[in-house]
Regions:
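S-adenosyl-L-methionine
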Residues: 1-55
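Conserved class I S-adenosyl-L-methionine
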Residues: 57-66
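Conserved SAM-binding loop of SAM-dependent methyltransferases across substrates and taxa
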Residues: 67-78
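Conserved SAM/SAH-binding beta-strand->alpha-helix loop
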Residues: 87-88
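Conserved SAM-binding strand-loop segment of SAM-dependent methyltransferases
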Residues: 98-109
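A short SAM/SAH-binding and catalytic strip from SAM-dependent methyltransferases
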Residues: 116-136
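A short glycine-rich, Lys/Arg-flanked "PGG" loop and its adjoining helix->strand segment in the class I
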Residues: 135-148
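SAM-dependent methyltransferase
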Residues: 148-206
C-alpha cells in the first residue's frame, strides 16, 4: 500500500501542496473527496456523526480515526479516547493536530485485556469489515473489547439505491454471487493510484442479523436518507 489516503491527510496538515483525493469503486466512477472534509469540526459533521459523538461515554476507542477530527472533539469534552488507524501518515497528522493518544495499529491486533465503554466506527464504519465473511471476525473481536455495559456506535449505508430498477420496481444486481455492498475501493492522489481494497457498504438488517448470530444486540439509533447509525451492545 502506498498509503495515499494518509499522505493526503499529512500533506494538508503540513501544508505540503495538498490536493483533493479521488476515489472509485467497482460500481462507481472517479469521485472527488475534498481533503478539507476530513478536517471538519463538530458543526460541519453530518447529523449521524454528531449523534454518535453525543452518545459517547467512558473510555473510548476511535477506530480508523483518519485525520482525528472525532478524537479531537471528544478530547475537548474530556473523554478518555484512544484513536487508532493503520495509516502511519494519518497518525502523524493526528499527533500534529494535538490528538493525545493515537496509535498505528490494526483493530484486530488490539490487546483484549483492555476494555472500552464506547467503540466508534464512523464515516461508513462498516467498510472496515471488508466483506460479509469477515464481519464474524470483527464482531468476535468487538465482544472481547467491550465492557459489560459498553456500546459500539457504527454508521453504514445501504447502497441498493445505486442499482437500476426494472419495470416491477425490483433492482438489477450483478449476479456474481457476492453481497451487493461488497465493493472494490481505490484511492487516487496526485496522479498516483493506491492498491485496491475491499470495502463493505452494509444495510442495517444484514448488520443486525450478523450481530444476533453473535448474541449481540443491534438497534438503529438514527437514519439519514440511505445511511444509518447503529448501536451494538452485549
Amino acid at each position: 500500500m502506498k498509503d495515499l489516503f494518509g499522505q493526503a491527510i499529512l500533506d494538508y496538515q503540513t501544508n505540503n501542496f495538498p490536493e483533493d483525493l479521488y476515489t472509485e469503486t467497482s460500481i462507481s466512477e472517479l469521485d472527488v473527496m475534498p481533503i478539507d472534509y476530513l478536517f471538519r469540526d463538530y458543526k460541519e459533521m453530518p447529523s449521524l456523526e454528531k449523534k454518535a459523538l453525543d452518545l459517547v461515554k467512558g473510555k473510548t476507542l476511535d477506530v480508523g480515526c483518519g485525520a482525528g477530527s472525532h478524537a479531537l472533539y471528544l478530547q475537548e469534552k474530556n473523554i478518555d479516547v484512544l484513536a487508532i488507524d493503520i495509516s502511519p501518515k494519518a497518525v502523524k497528522a493526528c499527533q500534529l493536530r494535538g490528538v493525545k493518544d493515537v496509535k498505528v495499529i490494526n483493530f484486530l491486533d488490539l490487546d483484549e485485556s483492555v476494555k472500552y465503554d464506547t467503540i466508534l466506527f464512523l464515516m461508513n464504519g462498516t467498510g472496515i469489515f471488508q466483506n460479509l465473511l469477515l464481519i464474524n471476525v470483527y464482531l468476535d473481536k468487538i465482544k472481547k473489547l467491550l465492557n459489560d455495559n459498553g456500546q459500539v456506535l457504527i454508521d453504514g449505508t445501504d447502497i441498493i439505491y445505486m442499482f437500476d430498477e426494472d419495470e416491477d420496481g425490483g433492482k438489477w444486481i450483478p449476479s456474481n454471487g457476492n453481497y451487493y455492498g461488497e465493493l472494490d475501493f481505490t484511492v487516487h492522489y496526485k496522479g498516483e493510484i493506491d492498491e485496491t481494497i475491499n470495502w463493505l457498504y452494509l444495510d442495517f438488517e444484514t448488520l443486525k442479523n450478523a450481530c444476533e448470530y453473535h448474541q449481540l444486540n443491534c438497534t438503529k439509533v438514527k437514519t439519514e436518507e440511505d445511511s444509518y447509525l447503529a448501536k451494538i451492545t452485549l
